């Protein structure tokens, strides 16, 4: 790691601190990332070498400028919730720039350059550490094309996700009764996309979802369509039970070819309720 500090010194000043002007810092280096972000069987992660460079200018002012670059070409990364997987063979360089302002909102812009991903967004941090994400665009030109907005404050996260395509094929209901530690107290998500990819590489349309998560408690309401056919899915999970409800006039359009529903249902319609006991993990299906 290389760090350079530069400043100007006013000669013959009686106040040494006040005599120091135009304080700037420049740093360049690399670090080995090896982060696993959850205890899911298929966890989110980032692995590999990240090259970085950044500069911080006007350190003594009320408007500190920061800009830099993160080169993630030599990393692998995975976000399970939207099945976004970056391979080491893919280029991803992120530029960031912005200003720290004393007693005011600080705004930073993040964008990809010379990359296999299109990423562009704005992050704002208030003087009370309230974080806002504004129109954060993510497009990997394959299975993810989304715009994310939201905020995080006092361990409450709100996210609004819209776009042309979201991939939910790696989202699976895990059955376990392990105790977990939660950083967030409440998570609120609203999702609206033109298309969605379900498990089995099934692509359907008009996906909508509302998700409320309060630590171990979860509430999900979602829907999708394929031509004139409809699917509704809901889930209510608390400390005692985990209830899943699936309703469709033709479920075969929403599941993969290997799914049991394609073999077991005579008329393809379904209205299924599963209630699982979270203590013994036994389920009743009706």
Report each predicted region and the residues it spans.
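Membrane-proximal interfacial segments on either side of biological membranes
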Residues: 1-115, 120-286
């Amino acid at each position: 790691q290389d760090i350079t500090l530069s400043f100007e010194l006013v000669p013959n000043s009686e106040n040494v601190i006040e005599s120091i002007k135009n304080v700037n810092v420049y740093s360049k280096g690399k670090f080995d990332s090896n982060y696993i972000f959850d205890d899911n069987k298929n966890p989110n992660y980032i692995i590999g070498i990240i090259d970085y460079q950044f500069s911080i200018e006007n350190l003594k002012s009320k408007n500190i400028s920061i800009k830099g670059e993160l080169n993630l070409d030599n990393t692998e990364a995975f976000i399970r919730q939207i099945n976004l997987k970056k391979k080491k063979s893919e280029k991803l360089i992120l530029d960031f720039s912005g200003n720290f302002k004393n007693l005011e909102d600080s705004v930073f812009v993040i964008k990809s350059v010379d990359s296999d991903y299109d990423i562009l967004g704005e992050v704002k941090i208030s003087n009370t550490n309230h974080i806002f994400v504004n129109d954060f665009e993510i497009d990997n030109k394959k299975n993810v094309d989304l715009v994310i907005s939201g905020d995080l404050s006092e361990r409450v996260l709100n996210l609004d996700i819209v776009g042309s395509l979201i991939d939910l094929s790696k989202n699976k209901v895990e059955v376990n009764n392990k105790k977990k530690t939660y950083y967030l107290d409440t998570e609120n998500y609203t999702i609206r996309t033109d298309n969605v990819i379900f498990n089995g590489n099934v692509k359907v349309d008009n996906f909508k979802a509302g998700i409320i998560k309060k630590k171990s408690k979860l509430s999900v309401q979602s829907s999708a369509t394929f031509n004139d056919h409809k699917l509704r899915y809901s889930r209510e999970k608390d400390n005692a039970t985990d209830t899943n409800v699936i309703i469709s006039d033709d479920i075969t359009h929403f599941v993969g070819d290997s799914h049991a529903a394609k073999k077991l249902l005579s008329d393809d319609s379904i209205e299924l309720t599963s209630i699982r006991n979270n203590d013994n993990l036994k389920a009743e299906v009706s």
